[in-house]
Amino acid sequence: MSARPWIVILVWTLLIPAAALAEDQPNAAAGRPKRVLLLGQKPDSHPANTHEYMAGVRLVAKLLQNRGGLQTVVVQADNPWRNGPELLDGADGAVVFLTEGAKWVTEDADRLAAFQRLAKRGGGLTVLHWGMGTREAAPVADFVRLFGCCHGGPDRKYKVLTATITPSSSGHPVLGGIKPVEVHDEFYYALKQPVQVEKLVPLVRVSIDGDDQTVAWAWERPEGGRSFGFSGLHFHDNWKLTEYRRLVLQGVLWSVGQPIPPGGLAVDVADADLLPAPRPDSK
């Protein structure tokens, strides 16, 4: 893997510079395919097979292939990610799956402004697991205005457990074909939301300490555009679950305005697509 601070890989394996993506931005209204950025990072301090961000976003890219003509771009968005605002300005949607993402989105003023511009023009926003996280409380307010929920602050709640994830009775399009399934995962719960929020739909719940907790949601933002989030996916092996792959795929597609059949989408992948990336210290 290159040591440059950012890496952009088209799913067709064509490597292109960030400037070329930015130059395409005016074509968004001229019929070009919608472009979705899949933002991951190198491994953090968690053990192998957890927080496998790049392997996760590459799998999402695989699932999104041949879905309504979307153009999917996998990005290793390690700080300082100076080209990030350019890339976001050329995108129609973004998936955030990286370390302490709520802090990461908001800590750089230009980066936050680019996410806000993406939201303002109706772009789709998806966040997965620690991508919605911040140890500090300060980033929460700006983040929830974009994504709807945040795992943030010193009072944030999380738990590793074996439990059944249960789709809500909302009839939401993201839930097409999704059934209850038992999983072992770390879930964030009691998530922070905007002070006044409407049209935020709980999608999936898990019983934690006797209470049903929302761990996935869909939100039609008041100023236009859609946001989707799922707080699971601590363990990379959970991508092997059909229900997980379907939930994430359909959440991303819904966020960018793509139709989802009532019975859900096929999410078959090769076994090799489910493997985590080798760690630098692996033998």
Region roles according to the model:
Residues 47-49, 159-164, 233-242:
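Active-site rim elements
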Residues 56-60, 87, 111-114, 139, ...:
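Stable alpha-helical elements in mature extracytoplasmic
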Residues 152-224:
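Catalytic beta-strand/loop cores that center a nucleophilic Ser/Cys/Thr
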Residues 24-33, 40, 59, 66, ...:
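Extracellular ligand-binding/catalytic regions of CAZymes and related secreted enzymes
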Residues 101-177:
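A glycine-rich, often tryptophan-bearing local segment used as a flexible ligand/cofactor-contacting loop or short
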Residues 27, 37-39, 44, 48-134:
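Helical hinge/lid and interdomain linker segments adjacent to catalytic or ligand-binding clefts
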Residues 1-5:
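Positively charged n-region of N-terminal signal peptides that target proteins for export
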Residues 7-18:
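Bacterial N-terminal signal peptides
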